[in-house]
């Protein structure tokens, strides 16, 4: 049986030797696809062999989807190589399958396999053995590291190709590939370590450039995580470098005994410098100590704005053993005590000097005189420490008590300022000092009132001692004023302050009685 193409003439008039534009539709006049599986039964001429190969490789339009230009290129290449014996169809199919299993399809090599037709159409570059070897070598070098999927036998591009996939599918495929491949996690950690080591070897400017490029391609959620991570690391206290320890130099002091506080300032060599004399806290009030000067003065940066001369200080503050704080207190307040009691707002009462003297038993005979002298002394010398006027001695007899009281009141009469209408106490000392105002309850006019003297409870109420009315109301006032401390205690006046107050009031009444200044109606 003759081949369908044998009826065409050969030579220059053959349609295979014509130019491409002369017969654009000649390639479409191919037989059915079933005729391709038939082999040529040994033709003697080379042209017949070439024609059989052409008919075996060219398919009808129904069996493939190649464009017209690709088909014309394939036909012209086959006609140009008609002088050489083409490979049989089965051998070409075997080579094509080996090529597909060895490498992935690229942009330059496009392979389409059709198992139903049992034939394949490849690019003209694949027909040349040299081109085939060069292409396989170049593609295998680049694609050796990738694993070929079984789905690529038909020439379908794999997932690792240049076709972009959606981000969700990529993440799913990456997670699936990591689960399927146990070495993926190890390789990923190695890549991270290599990247970190490479970045650590860069300088600051290079690292800034790398971070600019990395941040520009990160997703929004990764950028938020990075920002949160940076804020957390920045706010952590242990990231900040530790502060260097700053300590003041320790002065080199010798074991020489320091005599007083002034030697700390006076022994420094800086004190001898006239420029630094104003920087001292206190002036030198004591002699220079016999000690080696220290290397660094203490408190040399503190100045005292209230420096005073030594002559302005009172005699009380002239002790060299006082500490500087006491000196400063005395310097600032020494002038206040030179004023009179009426002009001094900070005047201290006599209780600051010898208040403890009132809480000791005293003699009844010296009560009036010591009371006046004590007040006069505390008036002019409020800060001077006085001794106790009242000592714990034996009490005199009744005759001695009367004599001593008579002496006290006789000395009071000789004073020209004494009078019954005076609001102050008329009892003064024999040296002629001025009287001191007493409490309102000790007013002689109220104490010598005849109505109060006849009514002992009311008289005690004027002294704010009405709680002792039951103990003293049965005694007349003439006998009551001569009671001593022990008798009052036996009668029930147990408070020491109450007994002293009664004894003072008794002395005033006795004074008025001896001078006949009490109204006769009181008797």
From Swiss-Prot:
Keywords, in A-Z order: Cytoplasm, Nucleotide-binding, Protein transport, RNA-binding, Transport
Family matches, as InterPro entries: SAM (IPR001660), SAM/pointed_sf (IPR013761), SMAUG/VTS1_RNA-bind (IPR050897), VTS1_SAM (IPR037635)
Pfam family of the protein (one): SAM_2
Record field: compositional bias (Low complexity): 37-53, 90-101, 167-178, 348-359, 417-441
Renumbered residue ranges of the record's region Disordered: 1-57, 85-105, 150-187, 305-448
Alphabetical list of SUPFAM superfamilies matching this protein: SAM/Pointed domain (SSF47769)
Comp. bias (Polar residues): 150-162, 316-335, 385-415
Domain SAM: 451-512
Coiled coil: none
GO molecular function per UniProt: flap-structured DNA binding; mRNA binding; nucleotide binding; RNA binding
Effect caused by changing residue 498 to Q: Loss of RNA-binding
Entry GO terms, CC: cytosol; nucleus; P-body
Main location: cytoplasm
Composition bias type Basic residues, residue spans: 374-383
GO biological process terms on file: nuclear-transcribed mRNA catabolic process; nuclear-transcribed mRNA poly(A) tail shortening; positive regulation of DNA metabolic process; protein transport
Family in the record: Belongs to the VTS1 family.
Function, as annotated: RNA-binding protein involved in post-transcriptional regulation through transcript degradation of SRE (SMG-recognition elements) bearing mRNAs.
Extra facts: Present with 3200 molecules/cell in log phase SD medium.
Subunit structure: Monomer. Binds to RNA.
Free-text comment on this protein's domains from its UniProt entry: The SAM domain is essential for RNA-binding.
Record protein name field: RNA-binding protein VTS1
């Amino acid at each position: 049986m003759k081949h369908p193409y044998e009826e065409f003439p050969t030579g220059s008039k053959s349609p295979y030797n014509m130019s491409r534009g002369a017969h654009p539709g000649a390639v479409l006049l191919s037989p059915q696809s079933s005729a391709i599986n038939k082999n040529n039964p040994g033709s003697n001429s080379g042209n017949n062999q070439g024609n059989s190969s052409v008919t075996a490789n060219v398919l009808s339009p129904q069996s493939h989807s190649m464009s017209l230009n690709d088909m014309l290129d394939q036909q012209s290449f086959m006609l140009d190589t008609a002088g050489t014996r083409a490979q049989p169809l089965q051998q070409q199919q075997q080579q094509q399958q080996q090529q597909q299993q060895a490498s992935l399809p690229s942009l330059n090599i496009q392979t389409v396999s059709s198992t139903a037709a049992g034939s394949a159409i490849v690019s003209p570059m694949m027909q040349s053995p040299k081109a085939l070897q060069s292409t396989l070598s170049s593609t295998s070098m680049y694609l050796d590291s990738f694993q070929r999927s079984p789905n690529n036998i038909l020439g379908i591009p794999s997932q690792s190709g240049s076709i972009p996939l959606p981000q969700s599918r990529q993440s799913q495929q990456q997670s699936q590939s990591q689960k399927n491949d146990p070495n993926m996690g190890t390789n990923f950690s190695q890549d991270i370590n290599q990247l970190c080591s490479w970045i650590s070897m860069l300088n600051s400017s290079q690292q800034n450039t790398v971070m600019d490029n990395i941040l520009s391609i990160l997703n929004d959620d990764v950028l938020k995580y990075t920002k949160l991570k940076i804020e957390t690391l920045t706010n952590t206290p242990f990231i900040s470098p530790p502060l260097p320890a700053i300590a003041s130099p320790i002065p080199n002091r010798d074991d020489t005994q320091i005599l007083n506080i002034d030697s700390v300032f006076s022994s420094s060599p800086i004190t001898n410098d006239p420029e630094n004399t104003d920087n001292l806290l206190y002036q030198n009030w004591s002699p220079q100590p016999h000690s080696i000067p220290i290397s660094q003065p203490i408190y040399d940066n503190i100045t005292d704005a209230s420096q005073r001369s030594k002559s302005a200080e009172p005699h009380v503050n002239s002790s060299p053993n006082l500490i500087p704080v006491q000196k400063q207190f005395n310097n600032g307040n020494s002038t206040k005590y030179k004023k009179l009691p009426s002009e001094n707002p900070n005047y201290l009462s006599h209780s600051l000097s010898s208040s403890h003297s009132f809480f000791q038993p005293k003699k009844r005979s010296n009560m009036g005189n010591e009371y006046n002298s004590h007040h006069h002394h505390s008036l002019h010398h409020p800060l001077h420490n006085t001794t106790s006027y009242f000592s714990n001695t034996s009490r005199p007899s009744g005759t001695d008590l009367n004599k001593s009281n008579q002496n006290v009141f006789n000395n009071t009469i000789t004073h020209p300022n004494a009078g019954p209408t005076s609001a102050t106490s008329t009892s003064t000392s024999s040296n002629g000092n001025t009287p001191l105002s007493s409490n309102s309850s000790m007013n002689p006019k109220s104490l010598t009132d005849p109505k109060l003297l006849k009514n002992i409870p009311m008289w005690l109420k004027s002294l704010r001692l009405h709680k002792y009315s039951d103990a003293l109301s049965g005694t007349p006032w003439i006998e009551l004023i001569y009671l001593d401390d022990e008798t009052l205690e036996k009668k029930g006046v147990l408070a020491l302050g109450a007994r002293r107050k009664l004894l003072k009031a008794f002395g005033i009444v006795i004074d008025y009685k001896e001078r006949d200044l009490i109204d006769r109606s009181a008797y």
